[in-house]
Amino acid sequence: MGDKIFHNLSGKTLVATPHAITKGIYHKSLIYMLSHTEEGAIGLIFNRLVNHIDLKSFFKIKNDEITTPVMVPIYLGGPVEHEKGFFLHSSDYNKNLLLDFQNDLAVSSNLEISEDIAFGKGPKNSLFIVGYTAWKPGQLEEELEKNLWLVMDCNKEFIFADNPESKWHNALKHLGIDEIHFSSQIGNA
């Protein structure tokens, strides 16, 4: 058997396969892939809304100009390091970026972006996500071979859609998949 070809999925979206992942955090999840190398992979789930937070109190923004709470949704990005927060946002905001992508998205993880969002000077679109998803070397490739994930190009409309509950179903529709008729008996040719 020959060596497997590595396909970098950085900047792509993983869509949990219907019927393959039936419970837990990854059930009906959409994951934006931040990094995918032969050393492993990291991504952010962007359709697991868990609560809303006040940016001013959460980030301890000390500014008397903001007198009312600035409420933003908070998403669970995965089971790793819930104390870490990230803003997945449109690339129109480019201060102190953690990651910058070719597909008009960026990731920030600093106090400055939270202050800019609170003042209405932040990115046009953003999600605040705590935690992330990580795979060891070869782990994601094994999951892909088992058909646990479908891969689609990044679609900002899905990422920043208002209704997180419909994002997964809309991604399936975009891929031309009907969840009801999708067979759990799948394989690779």
UniProtKB/Swiss-Prot annotation:
It comes from the Bacteria. GO terms for cellular component: cytosol. SUPFAM superfamilies: VC0467-like. InterPro entries: AlgH-like (IPR003774). Belongs to the UPF0301 (AlgH) family. NCBIfam families: PRK00228.1-4. This is UPF0301 protein RF_0044. It comes from Rickettsia felis (strain ATCC VR-1525 / URRWXCal2) (Rickettsia azadi).
